């Protein structure tokens, strides 16, 4: 990824031009999309054109707001002060919530929640939290961020790969707020950044980490299990083979977060209902999804967490098995083995 001084003038300018063009041409684009959907008898073109108009309208609004905040912060000099941090969190909350509402409406997704009272109390109370979630399906990240921002009024610090910074709104907000934007080619730097962000969580801060490192697919699961075997981690490979709906977690990122904030409670989250529609092609083919996104959360108290790193890996796998069992009990997703007749592998982030 090019440095910000090179990247942002290009991406911000391009996004501004595209956003303005999409909004100006939106009546024509929507009319053409409606015609195409009527001719083909398939709604995808109209649905995604509507979604694109919403997306670029929000992108334009956020870029203008980011520019205004930069000027108000004396050219960025006051950007790290509490006032401007709160203003950026409010901007992020508004952007994510509006997009989420339109996204779930257009794709016909219904939301259902299961959660323990302990997890709810921890999220509602003050105190830093670590939030480890399964990663599968389109947009689960934004759904979780919206929940943390809007329902629980938390300030999420998200761990994600730097490739998403190609979106200038994500790029600007992610670097103005304490998110962990990672170059995954440098494992030590990734762990250090996760540890740093976890250590700096405030009273309403929550670190959102996907220990699997990528969306679940049967092929990714096979590859991950093969990689565990090749690296001599046979016990973890054997445990991963007994989990059909999740990728084996990569412990390094989770352990870095625990090192950074050893006193923080951990909330584990799983969700079901979106199946394997994790990539653009699958989403296009299955739209409208007309599904129920069911999520569940559990609190893992500090007192029940081992201090030894090796024991923490076992603890993490124990929880991941619990998430897998919950997904299996929902009955809405086909086990990985059924896709290819095998019980093997899939990858992740640090």
What are these regions (language model features)?
Residues 46, 185-214:
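Internal hydrophobic scaffold segments of catalytic domains
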Residues 306-350:
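Accessory terminal regions of nucleic-acid processing enzymes
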Residues 70-98, 105, 125-187:
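Catalytic core of membrane glycerolipid acyltransferases/transacylases, capturing the structured
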Residues 154-156, 162-177, 202-310:
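A cross-family acyltransferase "interaction/gating" segment
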Residues 12, 139-140, 188-193, 248-252:
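Short, glycine/acidic-rich beta->alpha junctions
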Residues 1-129, 143:
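Membrane-anchoring hydrophobic helices of lipid-metabolizing enzymes
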Residues 4, 118-120, 137, 146, ...:
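Polar-ligand-bearing catalytic/cofactor-coordination segments
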